Amino acid sequence: MAKRHKHFEGRGRGGSRGRGRGRGGSRGRGRGGSRSRGAGRGGFGRSSNDDNWRNSSIPFGDGDLGNFNFADIDVPRGRRVYYSPDDIEDYYFGKSENMESMKMGGLRPGHKREDTPRSSSFRARPVQFIKAKDVYDPSHDLIIKLRSKNLEQESQDEELSQGDAESAREDFESGTEEEIEEEEEVLPEIEREEVEEEEVEPEEVEEEEVEPEEVDSEDAESEEVDDKDLFFIDEEGYNEDTLPTVPSVSISEDSTVKKPQKTNLEFNDILTVGKVEINLAHDASDDGVFVSNVKKNYHPFSGYISQVMKNIQVSDEDDDEDDYEDEEEDFQSDFSYKYEQQTTSKAISADIEKLSISSENLKNSSDISRDNSPDNNEEQESKDPEFGFLEEDFVINTSEVSVTNIRIGFSENSYFLKCYRLFGHYESKWIDQETFLDLILNDLGLPEHRLNAYLTFIRDSLIPKEEPPEPTYSDIHFSDTSEEESDNDSEIGDDMREGIEDLISYATKLEKDRNFEFETKSLQTVGKGKKKKLLVQEDMQLDGVIASELQDKFSTRLDNKAKKRRTKEDFIDQENEKSDDLFKKYPYGLHVLNIKEEFELFIRRSDKEALVFPPLDPHGNKTITKFAKFYFMKTNKRGRGNQTHIFVQKVKATRYNEPNYNIIDNLTRQRPIFMRHDVSKPRNEYQRTERVKLPKGKFHVKEGEVVGQDAPVIDRNNIGRILLERLGWSEGEGLGIQGNKGISEPVFAVVKKSKTGLRHERKKRIE
């Protein structure tokens, strides 16, 4: 059979491509193929949608839109009333933006096509609201029932409360009458007053709780009783065994019934007494005011305030009668309500003017305030013994640290100190407080609880305490009378006045030279290192010989300093100079440059993975750890006690990071020398000197010998003599300026052995 082409498919109405003439199936026989474009009779454009319209089993709009206007949707109308909701949704909410679609409903204002005769336009019918005949409210009946039930319950409670009050009042009145009759029958008139005083206390207590209602005047007149029924004569007396006990009347309290109390006053929760603020609280149940307990003592005077508030007492001089009248009025108005006794421990009267504080309590509160004052706390802290009074203070050697100055800052202080153990030299430097505390606690080993005492000791030694100025007695008047002058003149004799004028003239003559001050300057030098020389200025006008001698002395001074200074070569053992074992290479200690050199050699060698340093003191081990940190290496501590040493290892970061030479150079400028902790120097290296006792020759002097007669004359090469000769002095002259020269010849002292002064005369008298 010959192959049929695509253009033969879908003949008829709505073929696959809309070209067929037949009824239109999938192959040209049905009513429209799947890809029909509406060329046939009544084609909609999409044959699949056409099938959905006709074959859908879902009623359109659940039957609510049965009278749907088909003019809006151009589809073939069949005999069935089922339409596809998907196409309806696509029409109204799809991509189409027709003015009649619901998608554009929010964009068009009002009923735009109200006047158009088209049936496809939206309706313009107004909305009508019709009142229903019956109100459907199921909760309405329940609310009415509950309201009636609550009213019945309230009425029952009121009847019960009124009945209890009336019964209590009747019991109270009957009880009082029976007590009076029993007392009159049993007790004689003589002892009746004593018994009444004893029985007053429980009655008064009960009257405070519940007071009887006063009887109106009309009721009192109607209930008058004859005197015979009230009074009688007791002729028999009574015995103590037959004395009846007087019954007491008590009324049960109803805690549920409370009288509502209203007030028009505003409550302020802070009470200010002088400069003290007190927190108050209000109890809505009994309308009382009390001091709120603060759990945290946020104020240094909180203990004092609480003690004062405990001692506050309410003065009862004027309030007793007023309170009694108020309670009586309230009892008459409504007997069912009763008053709860206010607590006197924390209650505060509404009238602040009536508060009183007893003098004894005020003294106690002042003592408490003195104990809680911050000055007293400082005194208790200062009771710790000063530095130097405990054995723990002598654990460290304070002579190793010499603090000569202190800079007091806002957060921390700086110290200007001299410490060979820290710096490696005897020059003073400024260090911060953290470094100073690390030196005192870790290196020197001072106990931590004595640190404040040590810092206070240093501060007091450098900063003198301010002493009160001496009184000048400027407010005391001294009289200048002739009697005082005569007394002073009598004390000074004529012998004392001799030569005063000469002394005054001599003092005024030398006044300029006496107060002359010389400036002190450090030596000025030129050059560095071995070429360093003393700078001699032309203003000094020194001779060449003197200048050369000064230069020689300055160079000698530098050489002596250089000899004392130790270099890194001094610590290396010559026999083990190239050894990898640092224990043998540095037998006694290391220089800080030796540590840097060992790290440089270690980082260059790829075959060496570990480096072991000899044991040093804690600060030395910490310095090695710092070097390893900035060389990007790992360190571990090994050993115990004086055998503690540092073990250094390379890590992956060592290869890919360059050392931080800026910080490493700063470390080399700090402490220079680190001695080993586990080894001491051999004794044969010390030059031991032995003391040899030689017989001392007695110094003999002769009678009449001049002291210092054989002393040599000062040489002409002496610097002091050269300076004097430059100033104009010559041999045989006295020292000094013209007109005030000293003696030209020295005073001679002659040895005298034959006589011994007063002792000789005393022996002579005894003989």
UniProtKB/Swiss-Prot annotation:
Residues 1-34 have a biased composition (Basic residues). This is Protein SQS1. The gene is SQS1. Residues 35-45 have a biased composition (Gly residues). The keyword Cell membrane does not apply. One of its GO terms (cellular component) is 90S preribosome. Residues 173-239, 481-493 have a biased composition (Acidic residues). Belongs to the SQS1 family. Gene3D superfamilies: R3H-like domain. SMART domains: G_patch. GO terms for biological process: maturation of SSU-rRNA; mRNA splicing, via spliceosome. CDD domains: R3H_G-patch. Residues 716-763 form the G-patch domain. InterPro entries: G_patch_dom, R3H_dom_sf, R3H_G-patch, Splicing_assoc_domain. Residues 245-254 have a biased composition (Polar residues). One of its GO terms (molecular function) is enzyme activator activity. Keywords: Cytoplasm, mRNA processing, mRNA splicing, Nucleus.
